[in-house]
Amino acid sequence: MNTETNALPAWLDKVRWDDNGLVPVIAQEASTNDVLMFAWMNREALAKTIETQRAVYYSRSRKRLWFKGEESGHVQHVHEVRLDCDEDVVLLKVEQVSGIACHTGRHSCFFQKFEGTVDNGDWVAVEPVLKDPEHIYK
């Protein structure tokens, strides 16, 4: 498949893309079922993910494909790709290289846990930084 020629496969049409041509994606660690991160994909990103078996997302801020780990080396090897019952969310079951998925140097982007009550609560970091981000992104 050559995704450069815009000849994308028909199976992509089953996905319910939003008005911007994007679909939300959850990356889950295949071995532990830990939820690692949330991101977005466009058609090209999903096709490249299937083709290469490595996670490729779409960066809304940079407006381009984001090959997970292209700067940090923390790539995600994709074991399985699933589509939810409404066909509007993609789940990637991945092997997270180095164990770090988050740009903060943590295993998961979901490292903040709410503790307390609605009137007296706050978000608390409950996962350690595994590697200082200044040493990840040089």
From Swiss-Prot:
Its EC number is 3.5.4.19. Pathway: Amino-acid biosynthesis; L-histidine biosynthesis; L-histidine from 5-phospho-alpha-D-ribose 1-diphosphate: step 3/9. Pfam families: PRA-CH (PF01502). It is found in: Cytoplasm. One of its GO terms (molecular function) is phosphoribosyl-AMP cyclohydrolase activity. It catalyses: 1-(5-phospho-beta-D-ribosyl)-5'-AMP + H2O = 1-(5-phospho-beta-D-ribosyl)-5-[(5-phospho-beta-D-ribosylamino)methylideneamino]imidazole-4-carboxamide. Its cofactor is Mg(2+); Zn(2+). Binds 1 Mg(2+) ion per subunit. Binds 1 zinc ion per subunit. Its main location: cytoplasm. Mg(2+) binds at D84, D86, D88. The keyword Ribonucleoprotein does not apply. Belongs to the PRA-CH family. NCBIfam families: PRK00051.1. HAMAP family: HisI. Catalyzes the hydrolysis of the adenine ring of phosphoribosyl-AMP. Homodimer. This is Phosphoribosyl-AMP cyclohydrolase. It comes from Burkholderia lata (strain ATCC 17760 / DSM 23089 / LMG 22485 / NCIMB 9086 / R18194 / 383). The lineage of its organism: Bacteria, Pseudomonadati, Pseudomonadota, Betaproteobacteria, Burkholderiales.
